[in-house]
């Protein structure tokens, strides 16, 4: 049977075209340590230049979750790749690791070259922001598994850190200051609830601007996850950081305790940073309690670092010089978990 594979739903020629179109984007992420080119059976990365006493590789993997469904609805695919990279590199930089390279996995119902190119364009942008190379990936056309408009996106990153410089959180003590780095919005967690509250129950339109939003709802919801790698690595060069938390699924309540040693809790001062309007809209339309919001969403803070009190203001200044919006949002205390206290509105 001629073109049997194509008749089964797999278009090999479209796959070749997609690879050809993505190469120019991938090339912009290259580092001098990358060996070989795109299309080999494996990606290679030379570690010999890293003059570390005890080099440790740190890896992280993640996906974008149901935020992808917003990309399908809006037919916008050029930024969702940034989210895939961000979710991985932010997870390893909190341990002090410099991301070295990234590999992606795209599974789709139909390999449309222009759509695949746009996805990889976003992945490449995320890699540039993180300073890591996109050294490989896989695009799997899976008719029958996904509809022709659907795809899933995941990836993983590998980074490196000297063993003595790993940030573990084990030295955090009561009285350390917590600094929050602003998020760009919802990032990549909680989108099943977002869709239910705003689109299904609230019947809001992706094309309209609501409340204090500055963008149409669809654009607001598709804002890419902020990548904190470069400012955090710069911070680690100049100050001691005792612990870091990437505020992802589970919000403040689940993620901040992940960096804290036993017997230490966190006290967060409400009002010490600006909560973006999208969270207020979600809470209002969904009639969600504040505690539930903090247990699901980042609430405007995408990364939290624990530092000594006497260095806190200098660190905020350094982060702001790196282009970050940084705020002192609380401190560590004897105890456990996360508690919230009322503060002064910023």
UniProtKB/Swiss-Prot annotation:
Q: Which SUPFAM superfamilies match?
A: PurM C-terminal domain-like, PurM N-terminal domain-like
| Keyword DNA damage attributed | no
What InterPro entries does the database record attribute to this sequence? PurM-like_C_dom (IPR010918), PurM-like_C_sf (IPR036676), PurM-like_N (IPR016188), PurM-like_N_sf (IPR036921), PurM_cligase (IPR004733)
What are the BP-aspect GO terms?
A: 'de novo' IMP biosynthetic process; adenine biosynthetic process
Judged by the first EC level, this protein's enzyme class is: ligase
Q: What is its EC number?
A: 6.3.3.1
Coiled-coil parts of chain = none
| Known pathway | Purine metabolism; IMP biosynthesis via de novo pathway; 5-amino-1-(5-phospho-D-ribosyl)imidazole from N(2)-formyl-N(1)-(5-phospho-D-ribosyl)glycinamide: step 2/2
UniProt keyword tRNA processing, yes or no? no
| Principal location listed in the UniProt entry | cytoplasm
Q: Where in the cell is it found?
A: Cytoplasm
State the disulfide connectivity: none
The GO molecular function terms of this record are:
ATP binding; phosphoribosylamine-glycine ligase activity; phosphoribosylformylglycinamidine cyclo-ligase activity
Look up the record and report any one GO term of the cellular component aspect: cytosol
Q: Which domain of life is it from?
A: Bacteria
User: Keywords on this record?
Assistant: ATP-binding, Cytoplasm, Ligase, Nucleotide-binding, Purine biosynthesis
**What Pfam families does the entry give?**
AIRS, AIRS_C
Q: Which reaction does it catalyse?
A: 2-formamido-N(1)-(5-O-phospho-beta-D-ribosyl)acetamidine + ATP = 5-amino-1-(5-phospho-beta-D-ribosyl)imidazole + ADP + phosphate + H(+)
What CDD domains would the database entry show?
Answer: PurM
Q: Which family does it belong to?
A: Belongs to the AIR synthase family.
Entries under HAMAP family matching the protein: AIRS (MF_00741)
NCBIfam families recorded: purM (TIGR00878)
User: What is the name listed in the Swiss-Prot or TrEMBL entry for this protein?
Assistant: Phosphoribosylformylglycinamidine cyclo-ligase
């Amino acid at each position: 049977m001629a073109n049997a594979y194509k008749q089964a739903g797999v278009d090999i020629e479209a796959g070749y075209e997609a690879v050809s179109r993505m190469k120019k984007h991938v090339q912009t992420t290259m580092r001098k340590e990358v060996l070989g080119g795109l299309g080999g059976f494996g990606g290679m990365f030379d570690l010999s230049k890293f003059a570390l006493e005890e080099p440790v590789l740190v890896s992280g993997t993640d996906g974008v979750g149901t935020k992808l469904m917003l990309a399908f609805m809006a037919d916008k695919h050029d930024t969702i790749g940034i989210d895939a990279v961000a979710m991985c590199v932010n997870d390893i930089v909190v341990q002090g690791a410099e991301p070295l390279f990234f590999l992606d996995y795209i599974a789709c119902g139909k390999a449309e070259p222009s759509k695949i190119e746009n996805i990889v364009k976003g992945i490449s942008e995320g890699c540039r922001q993180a300073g890591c190379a996109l050294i490989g990936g896989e695009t799997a056309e899976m008719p029958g598994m996904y509809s022709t408009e659907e795809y899933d996106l995941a990836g993983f990153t590998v980074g490196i850190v000297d063993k003595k410089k790993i940030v573990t959180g084990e030295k955090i003590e009561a009285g350390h200051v917590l600094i929050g780095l602003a998020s760009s919005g919802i990032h990549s967690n909680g989108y099943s609830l977002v869709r239910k509250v705003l689109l299904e129950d609230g019947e809001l339109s992706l094309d309209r601007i609501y409340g204090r939003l500055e963008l149409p709802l669809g654009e607001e919801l598709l804002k890419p996850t902020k990548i904190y790698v470069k400012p955090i690595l710069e911070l680690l060069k100049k100050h001691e950081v005792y612990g870091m938390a990437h505020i992802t699924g589970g919000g403040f309540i689940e993620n901040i305790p992940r960096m804290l040693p036993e017997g230490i809790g966190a006290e967060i001062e409400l009002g010490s940073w600006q909560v973006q309007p999208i969270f207020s809209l979600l809470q209002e339309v969904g009639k969600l309690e504040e505690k539930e919001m903090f247990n699901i969403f980042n609430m405007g803070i995408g990364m939290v670092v624990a530092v000594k009190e006497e260095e806190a203001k200098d660190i905020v200044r350094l982060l702001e010089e790196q282009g970050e919006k940084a705020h002192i949002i609380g401190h560590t205390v004897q105890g456990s978990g996360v508690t919230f206290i009322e503060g002064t509105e910023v």
